[in-house]
Amino acid sequence: AEKDCIAPGAPCFGTDKPCCNPRAWCSSYANKCL
């Protein structure tokens, strides 16, 4: 089953899923969790 979070380096723009890393955030510029 797919986890309900965004893996490091995966595209995140346009989704409301959180980053799997709680210390990361979605960078709209890089379009990935940083």
From Swiss-Prot:
<dbReference type="GO" id="GO:0090729">
    <property type="term" value="F:toxin activity"/>
</dbReference>
<dbReference type="InterPro" id="IPR012325">
    <property type="entry name" value="Assassin_bug_toxin-like"/>
</dbReference>
<comment type="similarity">
    <text>Belongs to the venom Ptu1-like knottin family.</text>
</comment>
<dbReference type="GO" id="GO:0019855">
    <property type="term" value="F:calcium channel inhibitor activity"/>
</dbReference>
<dbReference type="GO" id="GO:0005576">
    <property type="term" value="C:extracellular region"/>
</dbReference>
<keyword id="KW-0800">Toxin</keyword>
<keyword id="KW-0108">Calcium channel impairing toxin</keyword>
<keyword id="KW-0964">Secreted</keyword>
<keyword id="KW-1015">Disulfide bond</keyword>
<keyword id="KW-0528">Neurotoxin</keyword>
<keyword id="KW-0960">Knottin</keyword>
<feature type="disulfide bond">
    <location>
        <begin position="12"/>
        <end position="26"/>
    </location>
</feature>
<comment type="function">
    <text>Binds reversibly and blocks N-type voltage-gated calcium channels (Cav).</text>
</comment>
<protein>
    <recommendedName>
        <fullName>Toxin Ptu1</fullName>
    </recommendedName>
</protein>
<feature type="disulfide bond">
    <location>
        <begin position="19"/>
        <end position="33"/>
    </location>
</feature>
<feature type="disulfide bond">
    <location>
        <begin position="5"/>
        <end position="20"/>
    </location>
</feature>
<keyword id="KW-0872">Ion channel impairing toxin</keyword>
<keyword id="KW-1218">Voltage-gated calcium channel impairing toxin</keyword>
<dbReference type="Pfam" id="PF08117">
    <property type="entry name" value="Toxin_30"/>
</dbReference>
